[in-house]
């Protein structure tokens, strides 16, 4: 990664990494720690239904465990601490320029917990402490405007906003050619 960073800088290219702050794999060390020590260090990182002995998951996918941003410890390891998942890579020797944030529209939200704006404002603040020019691109399946007001994310990838007009255009073009 360091060699890639050096090569990209030499070519005046931006280096963006991808992270999934919304959920983690069932095989992630945090999940394994929780399963071994139910009251351990990572217990509060997840939504866990004790009555049914199951994790809350992303869109019902059993292998994708939803992260619980009510946990201040989770926020520390994800973006607050200097060596957090977000900040570590924004600093030397990696010095990445940007993050693509997977499932940005659902991060921090689960049932009555609607923490997305709070999480993105905080994450932006801490990311910019490590790299004042850090660029944050959120993945959205619909309109991301609510998070693009200057204090959360810098831009969004909007699948429907791109795909729907493209499909309509292609379909229209195809009909005219035939």
Model-identified regions with their sequence ranges:
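Active-site and adjacent substrate-binding regions of carbohydrate-active enzymes
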Residues: 1-178
């Amino acid at each position: 990664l360091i060699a890639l960073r050096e090569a990209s800088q030499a070519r005046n290219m931006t280096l963006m990494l991808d992270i999934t702050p919304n959920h983690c794999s069932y095989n992630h060390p945090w999940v394994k720690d929780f399963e071994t020590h139910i009251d351990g260090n990572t217990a509060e990182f997840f939504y866990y239904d004790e009555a049914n002995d199951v994790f809350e998951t992303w869109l019902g996918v059993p292998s994708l465990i939803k992260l619980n941003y009510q946990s201040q410890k989770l926020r520390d390891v994800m973006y607050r601490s200097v060596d957090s998942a977000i900040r570590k890579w924004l600093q030397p020797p990696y010095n990445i320029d940007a993050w693509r944030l997977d499932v940005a529209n659902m991060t921090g939200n689960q049932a009555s917990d609607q923490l997305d704006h709070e999480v993105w404002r905080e994450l932006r603040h801490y990311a910019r402490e490590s790299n004042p020019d850090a660029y944050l691109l959120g993945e959205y399946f619909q309109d991301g405007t609510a998070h693009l007001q200057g204090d959360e994310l810098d831009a969004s990838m909007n699948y429907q906003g791109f795909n729907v007009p493209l499909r309509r255009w292609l379909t229209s073009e195809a009909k005219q050619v035939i």
